[in-house]
Amino acid sequence: MSAAILESAAELFAERGPAATSIRDVAARARVNHGLVFRHFGNKEQLVAAVLNDQAANLSKLIDAGTALPEIAIAGTRQLRVLSRALLDGYPVAELQTSFPAAVRLLDEVRPQHDNEDTARLATAHAVALLLGWQLFEPFIRSAIGLPDLPEDALRQSIFTEMGRLSLPH
C-alpha cells in the first residue's frame, strides 16, 4: 500500500507539482482512503519528503542493477520533474530529501579527475545544473534555438556528453 501511495504521489507531483496536489488526490490515484496516506506519511510536506527520497532510491537501484539507459532516463526524468516542481512550489527540498545517491555517484566518478574536493564538487554541480536546466526548460530551449525535431535520444546523449565535459578539470 505504501508503494502505491508513493507511486501515485510521484506521478501527480511530476504532472502538476505538490502545491496543486492534495492528499485526497494522491489517495484517489492510489485507490486508498486519504486517512491511510496521513497514517503512513503524515502531512503533505512529509509525503513530499518520502516521495523525493523514494524517487532517489529507485533511480539508484536501477543504475545499480545495470538497467537499460532508456528506462533509467525515464526514471531520472520523473525524479527531476518531481524535484523541480517541489522546488518551484517552495518546498525546502534540501531539507526534505535526505539521500542524494545519483549526485553522490556522479561526484564519485568526477572526483578522481580533480586535484581537490572543491573543484570536483563544483564540476559536479555544473553538470547537475545543466541537467536540471534542460529538465525545466526543454520546450523553451528547443523552440528558441530551433531544435523542435531533434530526437529525444539524441538530445539525451548530447546532454550526457556535455555533462561529461563540464565534469573535466579546466
Mark where each language-model region is.
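Short alpha-helical scaffolding segments that buttress acidic/His motifs in well-ordered protein cores
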Residues: L83-L87, A127, L131
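Amphipathic alpha-helical packing segments from all-alpha helical-bundle domains
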Residues: S60-I63, Y91-L122
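Hydrophobic/aromatic residues within well-ordered alpha-helical segments
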Residues: K44, V51, Q55, Q79, ...
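Internal, conserved structured core segments that host functional sites
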Residues: R78, S84, Y91-P92
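Helix-turn-helix
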Residues: M1-A4, S8-Q46
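Amphipathic alpha-helical linker/stalk segments
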Residues: Q46-I74
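Non-catalytic, well-ordered alpha-helical scaffold segments
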Residues: T77, R81, R121-A125
